[in-house]
Amino acid sequence: MRFHISSHHTPNNCAVHRGDGTPPISDWRARCKEVGVEFVAGGGCNPMHNSFMFVEADDMEKLQTLMQPVIGYWDVVITPVRAM
């Protein structure tokens, strides 16, 4: 099943500026592959700290694993998507 994942964080919660030792995820395509999720498309607006991805996964738990490094720092919305 396909999912749309949108995320937003504040400048203070940006991994680039946080300084808590948590490395930013700069390659979401590789992160998806690492956890067994197919990356379909993605992008973002860095100055606004917004990003999105379309992914395909057979298990919601994989999506939770995918986003785990940013949960608690980012607002993340995962929405199931089907063809219209």
Where do the protein language model's features map onto the residues?
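Conserved, structured core segments of small domains
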Residues: 1-84
